[in-house]
């Protein structure tokens, strides 16, 4: 690669080294394509550096602290002391290990790595602005391009992140001390996961949500289990309110929230906090690409529409991950990255979003895949459902975590599995079994007749499938 006015070329240009981008680059290199990967920050993107991995590290650490302090029922008496700075250092070590691992994987695969930013000059060329030693720029022609620039936290008016008291999820993963009082704006999955972390660590947590339910994208019977557990941890919810403004007072922030619907609430509320976490969603990073110069279309929210092969309106330009729209999940981006690389190499490939699982790492966890019962009915199907409560699971009881249930949805005519929802212990792990079943076109009988190890949480999946067939042993059918 020559730096300067010389124009170089590549078979595949990948912009962004998050879960979608680096996977796309490695897969394309495996398929004998010449690949250049451009990244302006740390390898791994938001997921590895400011999202999935660091948040799960803090979720794990806070879980250990919480369980140690609440195990009297088991005859264990402890009063753990949390050194948040040490927990953050451990978290950062995990991130560093994985970041360096990604760089090594890319290098070993033969991917050409560039540190810098990319701006489209036209639909076949970008300008690379280098960072670090040897700063400069160059033009790079490409046969195909994969845009994987990810997303960033949404700011709301009046709550800019320039003041240290107002933070996004990025900042909330790097507090130097546990806030005595924390206000979270937004009860989606990010807000609820971080409410779980800091309530476990001892913060007085208040959550403001515009709608009348925590986790509003989930069914109420699932969300209510998580909300009730959060309330037992001390989280205070204010539903039907929006954050209006804030003011500094005695070193703290006083937030004013107004009713989202004046018919439901007749007065404003004020909440005092050391930190205010704004967790109202994420927006795509497309505004730095000069994307119009490539002729790539975006929608009103800035996302890049794609088809099932991850193609944009330009046949040789692809988009994967958060920048391509909901659901914004790291593993979705990785799968899309694989598909885009394979399509570029001439292989038949497409993304099956029906078998795409999702997880929320609250307490208890949530895992979902495929259709809900209502979604299936709205598509003209006749769904049949089976459920099994963890209260009847020997393994859940022996883990002292018997909240929640497994629900499986299938078509009545064929008994083909089309969806599932799990709320309970290890839901994020359990949902993968049902995702695999959907991917394979499996039926309820396939799950129900598969012997599951006893005692395990996975037995609940077998029992739920059998319940849908009126053959469950450990519950009424």
Curated annotation (Swiss-Prot):
Pfam families xrefs: Pyr_redox_2 (PF07992), Pyr_redox_dim (PF02852)
Binding site for FAD: 39-47, 56, 118, 322, 330
Compartments (UniProt record): Cytoplasm
Listed EC numbers: 1.8.1.4
Binding of NAD(+), residues: 186-190, 209, 279-282
Residues the record marks as active site: 454
Cofactor: FAD
Entry's cofactor comment: Binds 1 FAD per subunit.
SUPFAM superfamilies the UniProt entry points to: FAD/NAD(P)-binding domain (SSF51905), FAD/NAD-linked reductases, dimerisation (C-terminal) domain (SSF55424)
Disulfide pattern: 47-52
Protein family (similarity comment): Belongs to the class-I pyridine nucleotide-disulfide oxidoreductase family.
Miscellaneous comment in the UniProt entry for this protein: The active site is a redox-active disulfide bond.
UniProt protein name: Dihydrolipoyl dehydrogenase 3
Annotated source species: Haloarcula marismortui (strain ATCC 43049 / DSM 3752 / JCM 8966 / VKM B-1809) (Halobacterium marismortui)
The gene coding this protein: lpdA3
């Amino acid at each position: 690669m020559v730096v300067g006015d010389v124009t170089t070329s590549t078979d595949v240009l990948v912009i962004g080294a998050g879960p979608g981008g680096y996977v796309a680059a490695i897969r394309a290199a495996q398929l004998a394509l010449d690949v250049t990967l451009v990244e302006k920050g740390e390898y791994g993107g938001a997921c590895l550096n400011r999202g999935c991995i660091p948040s799960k590290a803090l979720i794990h650490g806070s879980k250990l602290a919480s369980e140690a302090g609440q195990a009297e029922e088991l005859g264990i008496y402890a009063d753990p002391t949390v050194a948040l700075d040490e927990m953050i250092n451990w978290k950062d070590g995990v991130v560093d290990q994985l970041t360096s691992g990604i760089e090594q994987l890319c290098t070993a695969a033969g991917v050409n790595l560039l540190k810098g930013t990319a701006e489209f000059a036209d639909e076949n060329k970008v300008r690379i602005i280098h960072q670090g030693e040897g700063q400069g720029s160059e033009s790079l022609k490409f046969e195909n391009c994969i845009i994987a620039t990810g997303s960033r936290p949404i700011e709301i008016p009046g709550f800019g992140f320039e003041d240290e008291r107002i933070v996004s999820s990025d900042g909330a993963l790097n507090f130097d001390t546990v806030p005595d009082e924390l206000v979270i704006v937004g009860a989606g999955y990010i807000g609820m996961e971080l409410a779980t972390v800091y309530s476990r660590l001892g913060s007085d947590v208040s959550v403001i949500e515009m709608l009348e339910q925590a986790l509003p994208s989930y069914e109420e019977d699932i969300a209510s289990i998580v909300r009730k557990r959060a309330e037992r941890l001390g989280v205070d919810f204010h539903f039907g309110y929006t954050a209006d403004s804030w003011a500094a007072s005695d070193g703290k922030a006083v937030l004013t929230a107004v009713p989202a619907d004046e018919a439901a609430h007749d007065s404003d509320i004020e909440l005092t906090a050391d930190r205010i976490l704004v967790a109202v969603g994420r927006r795509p990073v497309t505004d730095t690409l000069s994307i119009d110069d490539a002729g790539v279309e975006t929608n009103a929210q800035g996302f890049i529409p794609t088809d099932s092969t991850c193609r944009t309106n330009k046949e040789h330009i692809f988009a994967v991950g958060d920048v391509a729209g909901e659901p914004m999940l790291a593993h979705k981006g990785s799968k899309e990255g694989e598909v885009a690389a394979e399509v570029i190499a001439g292989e038949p490939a497409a993304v099956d979003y029906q078998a795409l699982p999702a997880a929320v790492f609250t307490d208890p966890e949530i895992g979902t895949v495929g259709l809900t019962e209502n979604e299936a009915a709205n598509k003209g199907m006749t769904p049949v459902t089976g459920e099994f409560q963890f209260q009847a699971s020997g393994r859940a009881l022996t883990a002292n975590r018997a909240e929640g249930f497994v629900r499986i949805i299938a078509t009545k005519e064929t008994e083909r599995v089309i969806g599932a929802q799990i709320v309970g212990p290890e839901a994020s792990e359990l949902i993968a079994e049902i995702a695999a079943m959907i991917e394979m076109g499996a039926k309820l009988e396939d799950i129900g007749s598969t012997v599951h190890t006893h005692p395990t949480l996975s037995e609940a999946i077998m029992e739920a499938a059998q319940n849908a067939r009126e053959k469950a042993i450990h519950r009424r059918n």
